[in-house]
């Protein structure tokens, strides 16, 4: 028995409509404040259905409906999975992160729920669509005319519904502007197209803004050595050194704080994704003016061009996002971050033969989720019970928080080991800066992970820990307690620490000059 092409399109539009359940849940929430929620709700629900139907008439012509229909199902179903389970918004920056994700990180999201989701919401519907015997009208002209009529009628129905209730529909969407970011499959497809265009566009010539940079000679008895620890997905809200009380996540660095050799600060991130925050914090641009289309030298380039020895080691799967492209860099991709202790020891040994001002960047894998339980060795499993799966919905809030806190504690241990290496090194005046790229949501208000647009991101995603340690007591005294910092300070602090002068250096943003 054959089914008409138009009936299949109606059924497909209805299924895509159902996959928009996150969108409709947000609509229902917004309708609580509407004067006539029933009429407005019907208008929106019916309007979305007919818009989807008109889209299918355009992009799913006869003979291609099984291919394009399957594509729309895949996009909508997987988008709905991450939106529903992690509270993700699939904007351009998130899609850039997707394009840069390696197999190891992608597999960290694999769990039983995703397998079931794929089976019942992707494979089964696509299998039914492919198995259908669809009745097509003969003749290209006839098929085109019927398809065109279907498009016009469905879009017309949507338009009429909106126009008849425009006095309610238009204000509703103005007051709930984020709804457009939940609509499937349009928003993720639009975001992916923008991300792909950004990745495929030829890189702009590098702006050599460090050309005017100069550096006064270091008259101190010892050269400066700065270890810059670039964190991953650590949020300030989970640092006991910043007032967090559930678990003592800073047990290892506490002695240095007590001895006034180290201090912690709550800082604002530049973004909620590594692909944004890392290039931004090393850039001369502040967060409000940051533009990733501008290809300019960064703080690392300034230091290298003025004679500072620069080394970059990482264990983060995402790499350095272009920041270390023009200096010596090595990424390990190991299971745990303790490989960076060995890297630091070896580099310190190498620098013994050429004692001059130097910076060593250590980029940790840190607290990257959702597989938090894989970020620390078993001996660091101090806080229990834990959530030993990437399906966070299976775990209690207490289990998720304990597991995440173990990752923070492990990073704290690593930092204490880095400091220990600096403490026993007599060749350099050693200092250390630690700052995370962005924070993390652990289920607060139903939101997990990170990556929400900055304007609506919760504090858990935008507030990150900043820590400074130094063997130089005078330097420690110059960094003021109780002062607000952000990643905007990093570029200027790095230049100021090594005495680099440039028109791009702003003394007011240098943490040691405020």
Residue spans for each PLM region:
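Transmembrane and membrane-interface helices of multi-pass
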Residues: 1-181
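Active-site-flanking alpha-helical
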Residues: 239, 419, 444
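Histidine-centered active-site microenvironments of extracellular/periplasmic hydrolases
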Residues: 243-248, 423, 428-472, 505-507
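Catalytic cores of PAPS-dependent sulfotransferases
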Residues: 58-67, 86, 302-312, 349-353, ...
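Active-site-proximal alpha/beta segments of enzymes that process anionic O-linked groups
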Residues: 161-228, 233-388, 463, 487, ...
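A long, amphipathic alpha-helix that forms part
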Residues: 183, 348-349, 387-432, 468
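A short beta-strand-to-alpha-helix junction
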Residues: 290-295, 398-409, 455-462, 474-494, ...
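Alpha-helical packing segments of well-folded alpha/beta enzyme cores
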Residues: 51, 299, 340, 344, ...
């Amino acid at each position: 028995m054959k089914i008409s092409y138009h009936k299949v399109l109606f059924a497909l539009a209805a299924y895509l409509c159902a996959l928009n359940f996150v969108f409709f849940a947000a609509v229902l929430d917004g309708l609580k404040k509407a004067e006539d929620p029933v009429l407005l709700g019907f208008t929106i629900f019916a309007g979305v259905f007919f818009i989807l139907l008109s889209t299918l008439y355009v992009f799913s012509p006869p003979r291609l409906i099984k291919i394009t229909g399957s594509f729309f199902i895949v996009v909508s179903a997987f988008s709905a999975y991450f939106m529903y389970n992690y509270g993700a918004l699939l904007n351009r920056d998130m899609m850039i992160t997707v394009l840069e994700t390696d197999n190891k990180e992608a597999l960290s999201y694999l769990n039983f729920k995703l397998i079931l989701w794929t089976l019942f919401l992707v494979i089964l519907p696509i299998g039914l669509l492919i198995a259908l015997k669809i009745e097509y009208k003969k003749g290209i002209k006839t098929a085109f005319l019927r398809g065109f009529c279907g498009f016009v009628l469905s879009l017309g129905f949507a338009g009429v519904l909106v126009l008849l209730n425009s006095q309610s529909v238009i204000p509703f969407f103005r007051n709930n502007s984020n709804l457009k970011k939940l609509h499937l499959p349009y928003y993720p497809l639009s975001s992916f197209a923008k991300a792909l265009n950004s990745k495929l566009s030829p890189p702009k010539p590098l702006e050599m803004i460090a050309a005017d940079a100069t550096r006064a000679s270091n008259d101190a008895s010892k050269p400066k050595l700065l270890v810059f620890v670039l964190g991953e997905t650590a949020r300030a809200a989970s640092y006991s050194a910043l007032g967090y009380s559930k678990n003592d996540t800073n047990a290892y660095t506490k002695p240095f704080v007590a001895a006034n050799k180290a201090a912690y600060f709550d800082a604002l991130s530049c973004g909620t994704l590594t692909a944004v925050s890392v290039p931004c914090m090393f850039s001369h641009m502040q967060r409000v003016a940051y533009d990733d289309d501008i290809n300019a030298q960064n703080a690392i380039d300034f230091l290298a061009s003025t004679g500072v020895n620069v080394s970059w080691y990482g264990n983060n799967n995402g790499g350095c996002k272009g920041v270390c492209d023009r200096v010596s860099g090595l990424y390990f991709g190991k299971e745990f971050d303790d490989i960076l202790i060995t890297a630091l020891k070896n580099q310190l040994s190498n620098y013994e033969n050429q004692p001059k001002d130097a910076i060593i960047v250590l980029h940790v894998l840190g607290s990257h989720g959702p597989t938090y339980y894989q970020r620390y060795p078993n001996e660091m499993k101090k806080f229990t019970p834990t959530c030993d799966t990437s399906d966070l919905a299976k775990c209690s809030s207490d289990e998720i928080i304990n597991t995440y806190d173990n990752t923070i504690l492990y990073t704290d241990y690593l930092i204490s080991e880095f400091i220990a290496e600096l403490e026993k090194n007599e060749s350099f005046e050693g200092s250390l800066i630690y700052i995370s790229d962005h924070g993390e949501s652990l289920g607060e208000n139903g939101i997990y992970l990170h990556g929400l647009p900055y304007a609506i991101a919760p504090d858990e995603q935008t507030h990150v820990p900043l820590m400074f340690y130094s063997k130089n007591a005078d330097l420690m005294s110059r960094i003021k307690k109780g002062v607000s910092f952000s990643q905007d300070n990093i570029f200027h602090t790095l230049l100021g620490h090594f005495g680099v002068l440039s028109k791009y250096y702003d003394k007011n943003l240098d943490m040691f000059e405020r």
